[in-house]
Swiss-Prot record:
Site (Reactive bond): M363, A364
Functional note: May act as an inhibitor for a host chymotrypsin-like protease.
Classification via PANTHER family: GH10112P-RELATED, SERINE PROTEASE INHIBITOR, SERPIN
Oxidoreductase listed as a keyword: no
SUPFAM superfamilies referenced in this protein's UniProt entry, alphabetically: Serpins (SSF56574)
This protein's name: Uncharacterized serpin-like protein R700
Classification via CDD domains: serpin_mimivirus (cd19586)
Membrane-spanning parts: none
Keyword Membrane annotated: no
Keyword set, alphabetical order: Protease inhibitor, Serine protease inhibitor
Length: 401
């Protein structure tokens, strides 16, 4: 089989859905629903709860991940789930994703500054469930190959897909040793985001500044004075920085107290906030003039996500004796979920990417006049990239310096 030719053929067919984005570098929005915008509130609530639960189940600090990439991958699995697995995923996600929901999210997540892509590689020993293939039409590249003789080529092509779809921000996410004789499919999701700030930071303003944590560090601190959506209470400050496409913002939640011994803090040295609390902070933002200090940074993290999801209560999907995923004629269970995310913040804007690799195995407000606020992110903080019309979190992390 000429795998490379077939891969390119399917990829070209898939990428043709977004060909206007690449034509002469003209920023054209594909399928952006702007009038009469609506999305089931339960989807946003599900995404926000999932974001919160994942973030506070990490055992390490300085995390960055994409709730959207993970959620979309689990939603694609839900489409193929039999009764018991479907019930398990619905309970875990807090929502039963339909094909219409997935198509809707796929459309709004593909824009002039963002793209979401999917690839499904299936072991050619098994036939693909035709109903599932039909559901993924227009959403994913689907190929079949020999998982025994072509392991090296498959891992190479998966890595090429991820590298291409993330603008080379993520490379070599899997190798041929990740594919064994029991592997029956590899599902790949990527998300890529690149946008300039509406209010850029003057490069000449960037200076070395101390960043407070257990050990004092020095970071490149960007600086500007401008008007932003801003909120504060006795415990924290929140600011949202708009991009040129104001459907997207980066938010920073900055605790006012940053003593690492503070009992109210998690292992991440940041306070615990529920999705409802974060939404309340956002809803109470006011347009205010702010003296703003934000570190210039790059953050990257890779995870094996099965242990994290098990810790959160999702177990049925990984049960090799009892999972009913109908991606192929043969039932399969999930053996690994690899997730990698990277975010780059500088004076011009933000570039971010994430990928989720699922490996399946066969079974045995108004402007107000106020004095200038000072927002100095010189200690640990939570940050996120959010799609404003839906309220969906695309990336979520904590910066520790």
């Amino acid at each position: 089989m000429d795998y490379s030719h077939k891969y390119i053929k399917y990829k070209k067919k898939y990428l043709s859905l977004r060909n206007k984005l690449d034509r002469e570098n003209t920023p054209v929005i594909i399928s952006r629903i702007e009038d009469n915008f609506s999305i089931d509130d339960k989807i946003t609530q599900s995404n926000n709860n999932f974001t919160n639960n994942v973030f506070y189940n990490f055992d390490t600090s300085a995390n960055i991940f994409s709730p959207m990439s993970l959620t979309f991958s689990l939603a694609l699995l839900q489409l193929a789930a039999g009764s018991e697995t479907d019930k398990s995923l619905t309970k875990f996600l807090g929502y039963k994703y339909s094909l219409d929901d997935i198509n809707y999210l796929f459309n709004i997540m593909n824009s002039s500054i963002m793209k979401l892509s999917n690839l499904l590689v299936v072991n050619n020993k098994y036939s693909i469930n035709q109903e599932y293939r039909s559901m993924l039409n227009g959403i994913a590249v689907i190929v079949q190959d020999d998982f025994i003789t072509n392991k090296k080529l498959i891992s190479q092509k998966v890595n090429e897909f991820v590298e291409s779809e993330t603008n080379a921000m993520i490379k070599n996410v899997i190798n041929d040793s990740d594919i064994d004789n029991k592997s029956v499919f590899i599902m790949v999701n990527t998300i890529y985001f690149k946008a300039n700030w509406k209010h850029k930071f003057p490069v000449d303003n960037t200076t070395k500044m101390r960043f407070h944590r257990t050990q004092e560090d020095v970071v490149d601190m960007m600086y500007q004075v401008n008007s932003f959506n801003y909120y504060e209470n006795k415990a924290l400050q929140l600011i949202e920085l708009p991009y040129n496409d104001e459907d997207y913002v980066m938010g920073i939640i900055l605790p006012k107290v940053y003593n690492t011994d503070n009992v109210d803090y998690t292992i991440n040295n940041v306070p615990m906030f529920s999705p409802a609390e974060i939404n309340e902070f956002i809803n109470n933002c006011q347009y205010s003039k702010v003296e703003l200090y934000v570190p210039k940074f790059t953050q990257r993290k890779r995870y094996e996500f099965v242990p994290i999801l098990k810790k959160m209560g999702l177990t049925h999907l990984f049960n090799k004796n009892d999972t009913d995923l109908n991606i192929m004629a043969k039932d399969a269970y999930i053996s690994r979920i690899i997730h990698e995310a990277v975010v780059v913040i500088d004076e011009i804007g933000t570039e971010a990417a994430a990928t989720t690799i699922v490996i399946g195995q066969a079974m045995a407000t108004r402007p107000v006049k106020q004095k200038i606020k000072v927002f100095k992110a010189d200690h640990a903080f939570i940050y996120y990239i959010r799609h404003q019309p839906t309220g969906l979190f695309l990336f979520f992390g904590d910066y520790q310096g």
